Amino acid sequence: TSYTRNRNFDLGAGQHKHVSQLSAYIKRRIITEEDVLKRVLSAHSLNEAGKFIDEIFWRTYFKGWLESRSQIWMQYCADVHHLTHELQTQSGLRDRWAAACLGETGIDCFDAWAKELAETGYLHNHARMWFASIWVYTLQLPWQLGADFFLRHLLDGDAASNTLSWRWVVGLHSVG
């Protein structure tokens, strides 16, 4: 389907025609995952809608995974608290963090994504992963501060999907 072929392409700010953009509505329970699945399956076969359905199930999986391991969330919150204090006392960390949050790193794609997120509350799903990778591996910033930046700005910011996706980028959510 068109969704399966094109969902991974970020066409730029405001040009998200290949993704559903339903996540903010699901987060606020305006619609439920079940509602979305029923609607999709009423219009498409399971084979046609398979990849879209997979993405809905990932959200549910992450929610259940984190709920059954609440210590992961508690540690993340403690880390953010500690790192927020470090931002006050470590000027190098603070400067890199501020540049990243303001979209002033000099990395064009990253800066555009930071500004899009701050201005619109949305970022394409793959841009989120690329952003996280640059945040951690290029800018050398703690993943927890990046996850916090996302949660503070994303209209669809979901504690489980966000935290566990950032953990996945840094290799903490995958065994091996």
Which sequence ranges carry the predicted segments?
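Residues lining hydrophobic/aromatic ligand-binding pockets adjacent to catalytic sites
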Residues: 1-176
